[in-house]
Swiss-Prot record:
The keyword Cytoplasm applies. One of its GO terms (cellular component) is cytosol. GO terms for molecular function: structural constituent of ribosome. PROSITE patterns: RIBOSOMAL_L21E (PS01171). Pfam families: Ribosomal_L21e. It is found in: Cytoplasm. This is Large ribosomal subunit protein eL21B. PANTHER family: 60S RIBOSOMAL PROTEIN L21. Component of the large ribosomal subunit (LSU). Mature yeast ribosomes consist of a small (40S) and a large (60S) subunit. The 40S small subunit contains 1 molecule of ribosomal RNA (18S rRNA) and 33 different proteins (encoded by 57 genes). The large 60S subunit contains 3 rRNA molecules (25S, 5.8S and 5S rRNA) and 46 different proteins (encoded by 81 genes). Component of the ribosome, a large ribonucleoprotein complex responsible for the synthesis of proteins in the cell. The small ribosomal subunit (SSU) binds messenger RNAs (mRNAs) and translates the encoded message by selecting cognate aminoacyl-transfer RNA (tRNA) molecules. The large subunit (LSU) contains the ribosomal catalytic site termed the peptidyl transferase center (PTC), which catalyzes the formation of peptide bonds, thereby polymerizing the amino acids delivered by tRNAs into a polypeptide chain. Present with 66400 molecules/cell in log phase SD medium. There are 2 genes for eL21 in yeast.
Length: 160
């Protein structure tokens, strides 16, 4: 018996709804605003078949290039062979969500702007570069009432 290679083949678990998340789509999904240039994640909603992406694009991140009343155009870079092709997808809003990939960066930009303004008001230089975790500070262990013990491995013995 031959194998079927349909458009939604092998998506039994990929497109299923989460536990206790079945039913109608929440209104907040439709009230989100998408603008050209926004970064979005593709996550297909199995209860809405219209405007659903192919299984390859599940979990991919792209940039919005077009917005219509019922769908959003997204540009994805797809690796084909040894090159990337720009793929343009037209997806319904149920199948995308705003990406959090730039969230930490934008928060850091705001924090740096606040630090820079505060330093300028005080007239001091400010360090804005992130520093890697430094080694722990040195400590002194007292041996008073705490005699060091010499440890040795237990010899391996076999009794057969």
């Amino acid at each position: 018996m031959g194998k079927s290679h349909g458009y939604r083949s092998r998506t039994r678990y990929m497109f299923q709804r989460d536990f206790r998340k079945h039913g109608a789509v929440h209104m907040s999904t439709y009230l989100k605003i998408y603008k050209v240039g926004d970064i979005v994640d593709i996550k297909a909603n199995g209860s809405i078949q219209k405007g659903m992406p192919h299984k390859f694009y599940q979990g991919k991140t792209g940039v919005v290039y077009n917005v219509t009343k019922s769908s959003v155009g997204v540009i994805i870079n797809k690796m084909v062979g040894n090159r990337y092709l720009e793929k343009r997808l037209n997806l319904r809003v149920e199948h995308i969500k705003h990406s959090k990939c730039r969230q930490e960066f934008l928060e850091r930009v705001k924090a740096n702007a606040a630090k820079r303004a505060e330093a300028k008001a005080q007239g001091v230089a400010v360090q804005l570069k992130r520093q890697p975790a430094q080694p722990r500070e040195s400590r002194i262990v007292s041996t008073e009432g705490n005699v060091p013990q010499t440890l040795a491995p237990v010899p391996y013995e076999t009794f057969i």
